Swiss-Prot record:
Its EC number is 2.1.1.182. It is an enzyme of class 2 (transferase). This is Ribosomal RNA small subunit methyltransferase A. It comes from Lactobacillus helveticus (strain DPC 4571). Keywords: Cytoplasm, Methyltransferase, RNA-binding, rRNA processing, S-adenosyl-L-methionine, Transferase. It catalyses: adenosine(1518)/adenosine(1519) in 16S rRNA + 4 S-adenosyl-L-methionine = N(6)-dimethyladenosine(1518)/N(6)-dimethyladenosine(1519) in 16S rRNA + 4 S-adenosyl-L-homocysteine + 4 H(+). PROSITE patterns: RRNA_A_DIMETH, SAM_RNA_A_N6_MT. Belongs to the class I-like SAM-binding methyltransferase superfamily. rRNA adenine N(6)-methyltransferase family. RsmA subfamily. It is found in: Cytoplasm. GO terms for cellular component: cytosol. S-adenosyl-L-methionine binds at residues 31, 33, 58, 79, 111, 136. Specifically dimethylates two adjacent adenosines (A1518 and A1519) in the loop of a conserved hairpin near the 3'-end of 16S rRNA in the 30S particle. May play a critical role in biogenesis of 30S subunits. Its main location: cytoplasm.
């Protein structure tokens, strides 16, 4: 198969699968993207330019990796499937422009949730410059990865992530919607959320049961003032612990004293019978400020 045919095309993906006896591993949430328009759409959404430093999570057989490299990015990829490095080494272009592949691409066999980013990236990336994350995320670890990236101390320019459509809807949710919850609030206090692209489930091999969305997360320039982020996230989760109950009922565990609880609800300017999904992010921040950190 001529290598001028993109890895992400259905034809070349099938050739690679046959050549290396690849089987998508359900336990790793593997679904290979075979829609070249979607792949190029991800690269465009990530606004990739020559010289950009990109962390890719789960490169698979290299469908997205190839296009990131061709767009001029320097790519550091995390992968947990030890059967894939051989494929990436053989199938990715040997040269990108005038540079050999090893100057522009580095693969680390490691779970990104166990990554020490600064240690891993040292010597390959210029750590004084911002980093972009681009990934087709396995559905089963989407939320932990988003939290891990949001809470890391790396200087991120943006995170462009393909994920289950349902998760994307939770990320961009507004107060009053059923999708609004702890994930929404945790992410929106750190990042601007934009859904850039919808990807049909037919764009994957094997075909998942659900559609996907490509979401671009950009760090907020003016983040809300949260004194203790770990405490804030815990308070939000506690407020949503019994979603159908009123705010007053959910706060009983956090503020046993009824007078103090009533005073806080009055300060928030809300009805005690309001449910947590109707509160704004600013109101959750105020609740956390009034509950002592443990």
């Amino acid at each position: 198969m001529a290598n001028n045919i993109p890895i992400g095309s259905a034809v070349r993906t099938q050739v690679i699968i046959n050549r290396y006896f690849v089987k998508a591993k359900k336990n790793l949430g593997q679904n290979f993207l075979i829609d070249q328009n979607a792949i190029l759409g991800i690269v465009e959404a990530a606004d990739i330019h020559a010289g950009d430093q990109v962390i890719e999570i789960g490169p698979g057989i290299g469908s997205l990796t190839e296009q990131l490299l061709l767009a001029g990015a320097k790519v550091f990829a995390y992968e947990v499937d030890d059967s894939l490095p051989e494929i990436l080494q053989n199938e990715l272009p040997k040269k990108i422009g005038d540079a050999p592949l090893e100057d522009r691409f580095k693969l680390m066999l490691k779970d990104v949730l166990k990554a020490n980013f600064k240690e891993d990236l040292a010597g390959f990336f210029d750590m004084s410059k911002p980093i972009k994350v681009v990934a087709n995320l396995p559905y089963y670890i989407t939320t932990p990865i988003i939290f891990a990236l949001a809470e890391s101390d790396l200087h991120f320019a943006s995170l462009t992530l393909m994920m289950q459509k349902e998760v994307a809807e939770r990320l961009e949710a507004k107060p009053g919607s059923k999708e609004y919850g702890p994930l929404t609030i945790s992410v929106q206090t750190e990042m601007d959320v934009k859904v850039a692209l919808e990807v049909n489930h037919n764009s994957f091999m094997p075909r998942p049961k659900v559609d996907s969305s490509v979401v671009v997360l950009t760090p907020l320039k003016n983040k809300p003032e949260i004194e203790n982020r770990k405490h804030f996230v815990w308070v939000v989760k506690m407020c949503f612990s019994q979603r159908r109950k009123t705010l007053n009922n959910n706060l009983k565990t956090l503020i046993p004293d009824s007078e103090k609880r009533e005073a806080l609800i009055k300060k928030l300017g809300v009805d005690p019978r309001v449910r947590p999904e109707n509160l704004t992010i600013e109101q959750f921040i105020e609740i956390a400020r009034n509950i002592p950190a443990k």
